[in-house]
UniProtKB/Swiss-Prot annotation:
Keywords: Isomerase, tRNA processing
Disulfide-bonded cysteines: none
Residue numbers annotated as active site: D87
EC class of the enzyme, as a word: isomerase
PROSITE patterns in UniProt: TRUD (PS50984), UPF0024 (PS01268)
Enzyme Commission number(s) of this protein: 5.4.99.27
Family recorded in the similarity comment: Belongs to the pseudouridine synthase TruD family.
Physiological role: Could be responsible for synthesis of pseudouridine from uracil-13 in transfer RNAs.
Lineage: Archaea, Methanobacteriati, Methanobacteriota, Stenosarchaea group, Methanomicrobia
Molecular-function annotations in GO: RNA binding; tRNA pseudouridine(13) synthase activity
Annotated GO biological process: tRNA pseudouridine synthesis
Catalytic activity entry: uridine(13) in tRNA = pseudouridine(13) in tRNA
InterPro entries xrefs: PsdUridine_synth_cat_dom_sf (IPR020103), PsdUridine_synth_TruD (IPR001656), PsdUridine_synth_TruD_CS (IPR020119), PsdUridine_synth_TruD_insert (IPR011760), TruD_catalytic (IPR042214)
The protein's name in its UniProt record: Probable tRNA pseudouridine synthase D
Length: 439
């Protein structure tokens, strides 16, 4: 029996779907151990007002690189398009577009740990919708098993994933915070309209994996609400907590206003994380009650494949006794996908046994459905939608001696996932370790 780490249980994940022992190991001992190659549905030509480039970067945050690139080219950042941001602590390859740019201008670009390759031209910029997925090439190091046992565990886990048709499409620990999984806790308080509790949780709730001095100053602020002391003691890298405390120094009761100091994408992350926690819990409950992920049952709601080959969450249909065979034929061919709810104030829930599971979880967690209309911060309101519950993937693995850790082995895993999915959902089934070792 493989014990799931407590931190994963806190985010709604309390099981593995593979029964094999984990291989252990560590990720990201060096930047090159984590590779991401963007998959798009674009084909570039030779004419057009946009220059299309392939950008390979090492240890760069995407927005920072675009900022530095546009400074060198002396152009506005608005002229650069890309389909998605990529991990910083990784070697990543993606397309970018630059409006009204000649190839010769790139001769002046010399940025550390980057490579730009001209692919062609287009009359269409790179946009978020162009991303269909990512290929991950990830090295797990410091594996303390003999080669025969390692091969056995890898082959059994891979066979199990193939037999299941993939792995659960969980929201990974990054959605919640690897060091401090707090975002869904904050989101729950927002949905319950306890904005003070939400603000204090984000600013001052401490977690055991944080540095001890950070835990201590958070605890003091939590007890005293002395934000001036907090600003003196909080490390500068905790810039979002510091921004909220700056606001509360001048307006001590304006907790909603303190959230307004955060970037819009960070504010939205809280309610999204709460929805993700409920969703993870529903998938685990479905598995424990013996319902499949790779096949629909009566009462399920499925969505259909769009032109890009991705789930179209706006096209849903309920599974009935009359259409179940046809639906499962589509599911088997990856043209339809079984879904679970990201709960909101206008959620469409399944019926039959899947619907019972969804309603049981919502009741057990005492989810206030109407609370997803957030009157104090309307932009955080969410109607809800449904998301596919299975990640179809076909991992490949390679075993080699680990040159960084004498007497140990390293395994390179190669797999592709659709956009919006988490590589850790695959890695956790192989490694079965604490999430911090995967971050």
């Amino acid at each position: 029996m493989n014990n799931v780490p407590n931190v994963e249980k806190q985010i709604g994940i309390d099981l593995y779907t593979t029964k094999t022992p984990g291989i252990g190991g560590k990720l990201r001992q060096q930047t090159e151990d984590f590779g991401v190659i963007e998959i798009t549905n674009r084909e570039e030509g030779t004419e057009g007002k946009y220059l299309i480039l392939e950008l390979t970067k090492r240890n760069w945050e995407t927005h920072h690189l675009i900022r530095d690139l546009t400074r060198i080219l002396r152009i506005s950042q608005k002229r650069v398009g890309f389909a998605g941001t990529k991990d910083k602590r990784a070697v990543t390859t993606q397309k970018i577009s630059i409006y009204d740019m000649e190839e010769e201008a790139l001769q002046n670009v010399h940025l550390k740990d980057t490579e730009l390759k001209i692919l062609g031209r287009s009359n269409k910029s790179l946009e978020l919708g162009d991303l269909t997925g990512n290929e991950f090439i990830i090295t797990v190091r410091d594996i303390d098993l003999d080669e025969k046992e390692l091969e056995s565990r890898l082959s059994q886990t891979t066979a199990s994933i193939k037999e299941q048709g993939g792995v659960p499409n969980f929201f990974g620990i990054q959605r919640f915070g690897a060091l401090r999984p707090i975002t869904h806790v904050v989101g729950e308080s927002i949905v319950r309209n306890d904005i003070e509790k939400a603000a204090m949780a984000y600013i001052a709730a401490s977690y055991p994996d944080e540095p001890e001095d950070t835990q201590e100053v958070r605890n003091r602020v939590f007890e005293t609400k002395d934000y001036i002391e907090g600003l003196k003691g909080y490390p500068l890298q905790l810039r979002y907590e510091r921004a909220m405390m700056h606001h509360l120094v001048s307006k001590p009761e304006d907790y909603a206003g303190s959230f307004e100091t955060l970037p819009a994408n960070i504010r939205k992350m809280f309610v999204h994380a709460y929805q993700s926690y409920i969703y993870n819990t529903i998938i685990c409950s479905r598995i424990k009650k013996g319902l499949p992920l790779n096949r629909a049952v009566v009462g399920d709601i499925v969505c259909f494949k769009n032109k890009a080959g991705l789930p179209d969450k706006s096209r849903n249909e309920r599974v009935t006794e009359d259409n179940i065979d046809g639906m499962n034929n589509l599911v088997k061919r990856n043209r339809a996908f079984v879904t679970a709810p990201l709960v909101g104030y206008s959620s469409e829930l399944a019926s039959g046994v899947p619907g019972e599971i969804e309603r049981e979880v919502i009741e057990e967690l005492n989810v206030p459905i109407e609370g997803f209309k957030v009157p104090s911060m309307e932009e955080l309101s969410s109607k809800g939608l449904r998301r596919e519950i299975l990640l179809s993937t076909d991992p490949k693995y390679f075993i080699e001696e680990d040159e960084l850790n004498e007497g140990k082995y390293r395994v390179t895993l190669d797999f592709s996932l659709p956009k919006g999915s988490y590589a850790t959902t695959i890695l956790r089934e192989y490694m079965k370790v604490e999430p911090l070792k995967m971050s």
